[in-house]
Amino acid sequence: MKIRYWLLAMSFIFLSCGRVADDVEANYGIIPMPNELAPMQGVYVLQGKKTVAVPSGEAAMKVFHYLEDALKNTSVTLKGISETGKADICLSIDNSLPNEAYTLEVSSDRINISSNETAAGFFYGVQSLLQLMPAAIYDGDRKYEGKIRIPAVSITDAPRFP
């Protein structure tokens, strides 16, 4: 009889452990969890030389340099341009978004981060983008030479608390 209870308890423990792993995969590992996250089909591969459309203004330029610095330990080279149509990564201004809000769209051929003209929204969008990348790019001891595979996703987020 004791063996039956012991087996039942152990089964419960093993089955409950599997759900935690599923939940971690479902949220894409972004902390804090965005208000809206819609997984999409495909993967964006970040490697080699990429262009980044940077709107005029100090806020977007600071965030561009932050992204450039975050990827310095990889083989990716970023070049800032002003033409949005030809860019691999596009920072764009959307004044319909509230302060500090952003949208992040990752498709198989492009990354787009939109925010109003404040640096905070662009910064939060870049933070979410960086969290979608493999942790190995942050290893300061050696350069990450592999392809950076970013899952396709659509995110809309804004601060929950004023």
Residue ranges: model-predicted function:
Residues 17-161:
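Acidic, contiguous N-terminal accessory segments
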Residues 1-5:
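Positively charged n-region of N-terminal signal peptides that target proteins for export
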